[in-house]
Amino acid sequence: MRNKKIILLSFFTILFFASHSLSEVKHWNQIDSDDLTQVEIKDNYYALFKHDQAELNKIVTQCLEVIKQDNDIMRNELKKEWKRAFLKSQDTWEKLIESDKKVIEYDHCGGSGTEIFILKYQIDKTIERIKELKERFCLN
């Protein structure tokens, strides 16, 4: 009878530690999948960023071409005003690109992802502003 109790107690002890170990493995797997999700979010963001950057670079090139040529649609005063506004937006964009690189580096070192989404919003707003300027001055 005593041997049965010892065997039963040993069995439940092993069962307890085995279930505890499994829950630890599950916990670490959950953390790994959460980290993977963060990496996927960063990768998706970076892909969007690259797409927006390419789109903006295309618009920038078109706009600079219009600034360089004489265009009857745009009177000189409008052209000057647009050029000032455009160059200011372009400057903002370049600063955002530079700060974005710093944020991505910071984020890879364990920083918060919040800054990335704030920058994405700022980048989107800058793109909208440049597109508005482009439409306003008939640059489509």
Residues of each region from the PLM?
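Bacterial N-terminal signal peptides that target proteins for export
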Residues: 1-8
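N-terminal signal peptide c-region/cleavage motif recognized by signal peptidases
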Residues: 13-20
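N-terminal alpha-helical modules
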Residues: 22-140
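A ubiquitous, low-specificity "background" feature that marks scattered single residues
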Residues: 9-11, 99
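Enrichment for repetitive, rod-forming helical segments
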Residues: 11-12, 136
